[in-house]
């Protein structure tokens, strides 16, 4: 197995699915992997049934990806809103890692005090600081701010190893200017809203 294959398997085992466009963000600018080798490696892994490849064709508000989506052979196949949430989660991991950070934990559909969150991400930033964020991908414009209140109490009722109250990131196609007028801060945590294109991500996390 080549180094590139090992890296691809490690990435996709963490995020469960990733698009060809997301792969290019990781490997496209690395001189040790040219485009031809990258495409050849993906094709080889699909022909050997290590990966499965499906058309993506997602065009939803600010999130667009018309390339292909790759799954580990045997992994769950996402469709509809679940696919959008899965790919937005993968995009978050890709952007965090390509910015020089290192994702340590990545969980989908996590429970905190009987409330469901779409994602939990723990990563170290460029300076070695550990950061934790809870992420909700809101596609229905039904944001309930009360869900994020009293997090210091709620995180005690979770199997996730929180070491402090995490920040909250809500990914939404809604009107960000209106959302940013909400009372987003209390004494312990912050809620940040970001569009589906994840523009200005690092201003939020």
What is each residue range found by the language model?
Residues 1-76:
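Nuclease-adjacent, charged terminal/linker segments that flank catalytic cores
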Residues 95-141:
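Active-site metal-binding core of divalent-cation-utilizing nuclease and nuclease-like domains
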Residues 27, 42-46, 92-100, 152-159, ...:
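Hydrophobic, Leu/Ile/Phe/Ala-enriched alpha-helical segments that form helix-helix packing faces
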Residues 107-123, 145-157, 193, 197-200:
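A short, well-structured beta->alpha microelement
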Residues 174-205:
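Domain-level recognition of nuclease-like catalytic cores that cleave nucleotide substrates
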Residues 64-110:
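Solvent-exposed, charged helical/coil patches
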Residues 132, 137-186:
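Catalytic cores of nucleic-acid endonucleases
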């Amino acid at each position: 197995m080549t180094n590139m294959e090992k890296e691809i398997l490690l990435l996709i085992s963490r995020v469960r699915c990733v698009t060809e466009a997301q792969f290019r963000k990781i490997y496209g600018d690395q001189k040790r992997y040219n485009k031809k080798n990258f495409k050849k490696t993906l094709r080889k892994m699909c022909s050997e049934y290590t990966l499965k490849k499906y058309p993506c064709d997602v065009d939803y508000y600010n999130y667009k990806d018309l390339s292909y989506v790759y799954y580990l052979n045997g992994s769950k196949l996402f469709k509809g809103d679940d696919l959008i949430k899965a790919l937005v989660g993968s995009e978050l991991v890709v952007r965090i890692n390509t910015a020089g950070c290192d994702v340590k934990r990545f969980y989908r559909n996590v429970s905190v005090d009987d409330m469901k969150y779409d994602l939990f991400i723990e990563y170290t930033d460029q300076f070695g600081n550990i950061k934790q964020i809870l992420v909700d991908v809101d596609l229905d414009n039904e944001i309930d701010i009360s869900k994020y209140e009293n997090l210091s109490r709620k995180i005690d009722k979770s199997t996730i190893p929180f070491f402090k109250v995490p920040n909250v990131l809500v990914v939404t196609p809604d009107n960000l200017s209106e959302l940013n007028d909400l009372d987003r801060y209390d004494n312990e945590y912050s809620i940040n809203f970001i569009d589906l294109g994840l523009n200005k991500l690092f201003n939020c996390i």
